[in-house]
Amino acid sequence: MKLFIITVVTILTISRVFDKTPATTEARKSKKMVGHEHFNEYLDPTFAGHTFGVVKEDFLEVKKLKKIGDENNLKNRFINEFAPTNPEDSLGIGHPRVLNNKFTNDFAPTNPGDSPGIRHPGVVNV
């Protein structure tokens, strides 16, 4: 009982000293910022350096998927999605083998000064 009385007196004292009730929240209205309207009628999505919308030039034309049984199939992109890239790699999950390309075992640096031996294998079109 003594602890309860001390707690209530402490809360009342703090609320009078700081002139606030202990469990209130206060908010003020947001200011309208000039030039920062979200829905600006003069918006130009192709303005240099800014892309606010989707522009037709953002898309690339790609090949259609092969059909199996008159249906498009997403799995036709790869021979085996969970095959290693090279015979000496460990079995299991690796980079997929691509249908139109052949992976070479070329581990030479790309430019003078690069560290030799560490990079993805080169891809050669067949």
From Swiss-Prot:
Q: Which residues form the propeptide?
A: 20-80, 96-105, 121-126
Posttranslational mods: The mature small signaling peptide is generated by proteolytic processing of the longer precursor.
Task: Work out whether the entry's keyword set contains Secreted.
Answer: yes
Q: Name one GO biological process term.
A: root development
- Expressing tissues: Mostly expressed in roots. Present in cotyledons, shoot apical meristem (SAM), leaves, inflorescence stems and flowers.
Q: Which GO molecular function annotations are given, in alphabetical order?
A: hormone activity
Provide the induction entry.
Accumulates in shoots in response to nitrate depletion and to osmotic stress (e.g. mannitol), but repressed by ammonium chloride NH(4)Cl and nitrogen starvation.
Residues carrying Hydroxyproline = 84, 87, 109, 112, 116
* Keyword check for DNA-binding: no
Which interval of the chain is the signal sequence? Answer: 1-19
Q: Which UniProt keywords apply?
A: Apoplast, Developmental protein, Hormone, Hydroxylation, Secreted, Signal
Q: Name one GO cellular component term.
A: apoplast
Q: How does it assemble?
A: Interacts with CEP receptors (e.g. CEPR1 and CEPR2).
Relate the protein's function as given in its record. Extracellular signaling peptide that represses primary root growth rate. Negatively regulates the number of leaves and flowering, and modulates leaf morphology. Regulates systemic nitrogen (N)-demand signaling. Mediates up-regulation of genes involved in N uptake and assimilation pathways.
The family assignment reads: Belongs to the C-terminally encoded plant signaling peptide (CEP) family.
Q: What is this protein called?
A: Precursor of CEP2
- Give the originating organism: Arabidopsis thaliana (Mouse-ear cress)
Taxonomy of origin reads: Eukaryota, Viridiplantae, Streptophyta, Embryophyta, Tracheophyta
GN (gene name) = CEP2
